[in-house]
A protein has these predicted regions:
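Mixed-charge, low-complexity intrinsically disordered regions
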Residues: 1-87, 93-131
Length: 131
């Protein structure tokens, strides 16, 4: 864990009780998006409480040998320059076919205009680009 993330994590832990379960975890740190500019935009949506969900392709994890996300995972969200800005916890994880993603999920993801049509257009492009 890089020193900035470690320091951020320690500040977060200091806000918790001594027996809080997060004290036993080592968080993953990551950026949302595929460019520094998009990472900054999405981190700002997280901080504003607008972005409360995300979507990924399962193959993106298996291709690099990473496990799929799990409920209860705690993560540090980074800006595009790698600076930590938020601690998030995965409260639910589901594998859903692209065509079955619903409007409620699209709204929780908080990107674009928040509509399902916008979500599908953006993610179809992003997922095609990834593969």
């Amino acid at each position: 864990m890089n020193p900035d993330v470690l320091s951020f994590w320690r500040v977060y832990l200091a806000t918790l009780g001594d027996s809080h379960a997060h004290r036993l975890l080592t968080p993953e740190a990551f950026v949302f998006g595929d460019s520094p500019e998009l990472a900054d935009e999405l981190a700002a949506l997280v901080l504003a409480g607008i972005k409360r969900a995300t979507a990924s392709l399962a193959v993106e994890f298996s291709a690099v040998g990473d496990p799929l996300p799990s409920t209860g995972d705690v993560c540090v969200v980074l800006r595009g320059d790698g600076q930590p800005v938020a601690v998030i916890e995965r409260t639910a994880v589901a594998q859903v076919p692209f065509g079955e993603v619903d409007a409620a999920f699209a709204a929780r993801e908080g990107e674009g205009d928040g509509s399902l049509a916008s979500w599908r257009a953006n993610h179809e492009r992003d997922f095609d680009y990834a593969h």
